[in-house]
């Protein structure tokens, strides 16, 4: 069950912030990726690992992306995956007494170093989806531009430039 992260100072997200809010608690690191440890599984249900997510996105396209990442991990071995919320400039909608911020979108970037290194980024608006995964695909450079985050700064510069500049869904079977 979802539970508050007591290591975070109050005010912090609590269960009741989500009740009747119209939003699901959307995992950033999915529970299905944490079956290797009871502690990791429990921590995946901390409210610091979730964001208010449109139900159709959480149960649909975002869930499909989580499953695709697990499939790629089985296929390629080690992957580096970073995901999180996107807040554009302007007034942010909130839910609950603790004013949990509702992201306008979410990002996920995936890096595979096995064989020829490759990476891909995705951006999902926090709303209705039901589109093919390829429609959400972006270069990692584009996701970096939107989020302001440098995702793989420790890669050798030549590798980083190459894998981040293009999105090739076909390289990922999309």
List PLM regions with ranges.
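Domain-level detector of nuclease and nuclease-like folds
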Residues: 6-174
């Amino acid at each position: 069950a979802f539970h508050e992260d007591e290591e975070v100072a109050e005010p912090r997200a609590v269960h009741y912030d989500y009740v009747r809010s119209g939003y699901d608690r959307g995992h950033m690191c999915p529970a299905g990726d944490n079956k290797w440890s009871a502690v990791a599984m429990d921590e995946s249900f901390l409210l610091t690992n979730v964001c208010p997510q449109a139900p159709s996105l959480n149960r649909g396209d975002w869930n499909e992306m989580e499953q695709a990442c697990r499939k790629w991990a089985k296929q390629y071995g080690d992957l580096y995956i970073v995901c999180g919320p996107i807040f554009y400039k302007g007034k942010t909608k909130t839910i609950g007494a603790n004013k949990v911020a509702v992201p306008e979108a979410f990002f996920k970037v995936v890096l595979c170093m096995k064989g020829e290194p490759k990476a891909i980024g995705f951006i999902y608006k926090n709303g209705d989806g039901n589109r093919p995964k390829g429609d959400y695909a972006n270069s990692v450079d584009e996701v970096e531009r939107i989020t302001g985050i440098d995702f793989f700064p420790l890669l050798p510069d030549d590798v980083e430039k190459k894998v981040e500049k293009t999105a090739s869904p076909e390289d990922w079977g999309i």
